[in-house]
Amino acid sequence: MASPIDDKMSPAERRAGVSLAAIFALRMLGLFLILPVFAVHAHGMPGGDNAAMVGMAIGAYGLTQAFLQIPFGTASDRFGRKPVIVFGLVLFVIGSVVAAMAQDVQMVIVGRVIQGAGAISAAVTALAADLTRDQHRTKIMAMIGSSIGLVFAISMVAAPLLYALIGMSGLFWLTAVLAVAAIFTVMFVVPAAPPVPRAIGRFSEVLGNGQLMRLNFGVFALHLMQTAMWVLVPAGLVRAGLPMVEHWKVYLPAVLLSFVVMVPAIIMAEKKGAMKRVFNSAIILLLLVQVGMYVEGGAGMWPLAILLTLFFVAFNVLEATQPSWISRVAPPHAKGTALGIYNTLQSIGLFLGGALGGWLVQNVGPGSVSLLGGGLAVVWLILASGMVAPATRRVAAA
């Protein structure tokens, strides 16, 4: 039997981390493959000349997710994680098929709305927390976060090539197939989930917890900044002389280099009891990136590449540490609910980042997007300074 101070993950924990990261990766790869090519493809579809409709087709997924993260998270507390995850993935498959068969932008929007109805992020994250001990939870969250970053980089490279081979309809069909693979992973690869304690009246417990609400603001700000960045970065790279089809040459190294920095940061946060120090340092780095984006103004490729790499470092550290922190602070019987609220704020941030970022660029100017991001980072840093890092309970593997 492992000792109580054993820092090695058990085989069951490693299996849980790899399989849950695979579920996120399969689902997110299907989503990310659409992003680099849909706006161009939509010009050839009925309704594609309406920029607002095209934007809605891209953003409708996040909007539906925002409404359903809490119900799915709460349902996973009541009925178990796996049944809720499978149900959500089935909805995602249906939405992908609807979008694949769409003949106009309006039907693509319908498909994207149904895709977003499969809001499983909270349930998957809660299951990851259920299946891991405290001292390894941030590592598991880092595995999940890294898988998302990696498939994002892969999608930036693969999407134009796959689009040329199978078209937009083929990409949506591929998305459906990937989601089916995720369903089989949930059913046959993910370890059995422990029983979920059931309780009533826990929603107010979560909303009344100041620590949780600070983390909820943090994920809202983080993903608003992330989506708004993509309003600026592609256009900045084009202005710097890099054609759209070659943007992956910046994105892929930036993501991979960020992982090299992120992993030691996560290990230090776990082993050295430096969670709050690493957390606040990542927020400060986000603030510096926003200042750099404002000062640099998209004038050169190398400054943009460096800023993007630094952004991914901060983003990946925060993306790994925040869900782990939530799962430790939340009442044990309400982890699904707490993570549902957390993922709702994440989805709202994703939606507003694109919508507000685009509006600001159109009506105020590109610099206003960086000012907004910098302001959010300052508020977040102030809120985070009042947080107390959760204690890590070191327990032996079963």
Name each model-derived stretch.
Residues 2-14, 190-221:
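Juxtamembrane intracellular "pre-TM" segments in multi-pass secondary transporters
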Residues 176-195, 383-388:
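C-terminal membrane-cytosol helix-exit motif in multi-pass small-molecule transporters
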Residues 78-88, 270-284:
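Cytoplasmic membrane-interface "Motif A"-like loop-to-helix N-cap segments
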Residues 68-79, 260-274, 361:
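Helix-to-loop junctions at the C-terminal end of transmembrane segments
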Residues 111-149:
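Cytoplasmic helix-loop-helix junction between adjacent transmembrane helices
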Residues 276-322:
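C-terminal transmembrane helical hairpin of 12-TM major facilitator-type secondary transporters
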Residues 67-103:
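Conserved MFS/SLC helix-loop-helix module at the cytosolic interface between two early adjacent transmembrane helices
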Residues 120-132, 317-330:
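Intracellular juxtamembrane helix-capping segments at the cytosolic ends
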